[in-house]
């Protein structure tokens, strides 16, 4: 049985934390009897309405909560109350690194990293430096951004992909995932679109079970 998070770390809500380009807005969701560790979640593209309130980002946080694990969603620079301006993924990686460092200091223990769409790209690029216990990529836009570095995953990982994604090339995601070594667990949701309308519980279940195994 996992130890509980330190008493001073419990609680949650909307906060501002220091980031590389100014303040970053974070949402902390912390169960009352949280275990040690934390999940950090990256949202979809900042220029197309992506924010920490995105429903897929929210469902990723709920998957962590199902395991009594605190979750931290955050707004990339220039979104919501986060300061700065869109930086084509470079500064956004710095934002995620800063939030992960803050989250780890607040909630010591294993780090679980997740991202949806643009946030999945940022998480993929950054995860070797963060050394998470596990990584979850939801609808990673492999045909839109360079997923060549890193070449391989540095931890156990999961890819969740909708078969009818209207934004991301689903076949390209499958081919990319299957070409990795080690390959990820692949949760293929036939008929699901990019935003997983009507399939959010399936996303939640896939991530929850992958993370449960990683934490065992």
Each PLM stretch: what is its role?
Residues 192-204:
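Catalytic histidine-centered segment of alpha/beta-hydrolase-like enzymes
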